[in-house]
């Protein structure tokens, strides 16, 4: 009787080899697939980073996609002006030119969601006229006292172009548009040999309980903080400072048992607004131990140290970048640096460095 393998044994061996090879392929694929979780408090710039990834790595937005942003941009613009006009009432700030009252009524008559391909010309004219009023400008300067979209001034300054009949949103218009993120959105893109699956989760408090679904096998956390909000209060709770909320959230994420082995990249975002605010809104009013006055570098160092010092793990490194999420050139450079960090972390985890 021969000692050769039976047909059944050969088939079993072949199946085992195929399973082992598939497991190896899966492991290689996992190493090349980066699961990145975008975290941060509401309005910190997470969705803007995702839009930048589309611009930088996916060839940008098609004409149809740009068209789809029109209603969002129109609604953002009208709603922002309405917020200012309502704030003028509560802050008891009058219009300088009472003839503007007609335009104010036009703005208040608009629905919350503007529909259509063109902003009605009377609405564009009303916003353009009212934005020039000194009373409106004075109220805008006090925007930290109420909840105003960061992009308000940008859209008001560009209202003539936005209200034109042939208007087509450009990259900046799209990047600055704001829709509250609810639930979890996933974006996939490729950088070099790595495939990124980037998850954006709602930043408002009511959305945070949904983050748990994203936690498994996360390679990296990209945590965003709007440092320009050091003097603002939460949308959901106007007794809580936004920067304090971000510090509390970062503490809970950085030191969570879920993320002991997860690399964390911290984007200290909205540096353009931060630099503008420092001379007119002293940081010491909100953080009494800060001693740097309106010096931009000193203020950046202070905030950086406040976040990094929360890390309780000696072996865990927090990678930090100061960013302006609407600046495509800068985000392209920063994300290239992030990619290098992730490659190094992958090699280290695989024992290759």
Swiss-Prot record:
Which protein is depicted? Guanine nucleotide-binding protein subunit alpha
GO BP annotations listed = G protein-coupled receptor signaling pathway; pheromone-dependent signal transduction involved in conjugation with cellular fusion
User: Superkingdom of the source?
Assistant: Eukaryota
Region: G1 motif, residue numbers? 35-48
Entry's family note: Belongs to the G-alpha family. G(q) subfamily.
Functional description taken from the UniProt entry: Guanine nucleotide-binding proteins (G proteins) are involved as modulators or transducers in various transmembrane signaling systems.
Q: Which organism is it from?
A: Colletotrichum trifolii
State whether keyword Acyltransferase applies: no
Gene Ontology CC terms, in alphabetical order: cytoplasm; heterotrimeric G-protein complex
UniProt lineage: Eukaryota, Fungi, Dikarya, Ascomycota, Pezizomycotina
Region annotation (G3 motif) ranges:
196-205
